[in-house]
Design a protein with these regions (language model features):
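Conserved PLP-binding active-site segment in aminotransferase class I/II-type PLP enzymes
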Residues: 1-72, 145
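Active-site donor-binding loop signature of nucleotide-sugar glycosyltransferases
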Residues: 7, 102, 161
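Short, solvent-exposed loop/turn segments at secondary-structure junctions
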Residues: 10, 60, 131-132, 157-158
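Active-site region of PLP-dependent enzymes
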Residues: 24, 157-161
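Flexible, glycine/small-residue catalytic loop immediately N-terminal to the helix bearing the conserved Tyr-Lys
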Residues: 47, 135, 160
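Short gly/ser/thr-rich secondary-structure transition/capping motifs
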Residues: 57-60, 105-108, 161
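PLP-dependent aminotransferase-like
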Residues: 67-146, 150-155
Length: 161
């Protein structure tokens, strides 16, 4: 007997098929189609943010964030307890991942171990929210401010955290 971890929300079949039909009729399958614009506005409201940019996946999102912050070399503190995209994004941007252990009760990066991993080469901290648990954002932000280090949160596991 299968045990399902999640049950996806699916719109009514006729509504779904109409949307797919509209996409095929317009012949706009990616990027600037009206569905993307609608998704961006919906997520902007849901997250309560002024700006929202949809990208194809979390790997690209992390790479864009690193580039936008001018982080193209140096060390990025993160956790090895994540999807490979977190680490590969750091490497693709010519940075070195520095791994910090996780907290045993929620599997998020242990903020008490971040500070001891900081070196003169540290450019950013990339904590990962895991399984619906958000990292200790306040403590991580305080550490980053104290050391003038940027923070990029990977919230792929905890959308909206």
């Amino acid at each position: 007997m299968p045990i399902y971890v999640t049950k996806p929300y699916l719109p009514p079949k006729d509504e779904y098929l109409q949307r797919v039909s509209d996409i095929f009729d317009r012949k706009i399958l990616t990027n600037q189609g009206p569905e993307v614009a609608e998704l961006e506005k919906t997520l902007q409201r849901f997250l309560g943010v002024k700006h929202f940019q949809y990208v194809t996946n979390g790997t690209v999102a992390i790479q864009i964030a690193l580039r936008a912050l001018g982080i193209t070399e140096g060390e990025v503190i993160t956790t090895p307890f994540s999807y490979v995209a977190t680490i590969s994004s750091i490497l693709w941007e010519h940075c070195k991942p520095v791994f910090v252990d996780i907290e045993p009760h929620n599997f998020t990066i242990d903020p008490n171990k971040i500070e001891e991993a900081i070196t003169p080469h540290t450019k950013a901290i990339l904590p990962v929210h895991v399984f619906g648990y958000a990292c200790d954002v306040d403590t991580i932000n305080e550490i980053a401010q104290r050391h003038n280090i940027k923070v990029i949160y990977d919230a792929a596991h905890t959308f909206g955290a």
